[in-house]
C-alpha cells in the first residue's frame, strides 16, 4: 500500500505486433507464433517453420510469421517431424516462387501424412485460388495483407 498509484502500460510497434501474432494463432490453428526477428535471435535454440509473410494493419512491410515447433532441451515431441517440416519448407519455396502447382502437390502429400495441419490447408487453399486465377510471377507478391486487427 502506497498513496501513489502507478499505471504501467506497454506501448509501441513490438507490443502491437505481438498482439497481432497472438490473434493469428486462431487463423493458423497454432499455439505460439513468433516474428522473424525473434526467430533469428533464438538461433539453434528452437525449431520453427516459416508460415507466412504478413502485412499487418498500419504497416507496409511484411513481417515473417513463424510457428514455434519445439524448444531445444525440452522433453516434448516436436509438433512436426523433420520429414514433414522439410516437405512444408519445399511447399513454401514453391509458393514464394509462384509455383502453385508444386506447392499444391507438396501440401497434398503433407496433408496425407498429417491431416490436421491447419497452415497446410490455408496455404493449399491459396495455391488453388492462384491456380484458378492464373496468377503469374509478374503480378505475384507472396505476402498476405491483413485488413483487420
Locate each region found by the language model:
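Intrinsically disordered, low-complexity, charge-biased linker/tail regions
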Residues: 136-149
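Catalytic-core segments of nucleotide cyclases and related cyclic-nucleotide turnover enzymes
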Residues: 1-25, 55
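Cytosolic regulatory/linker segments at or just downstream of nucleotide-handling modules
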Residues: 18, 25-102, 109, 114-133, ...
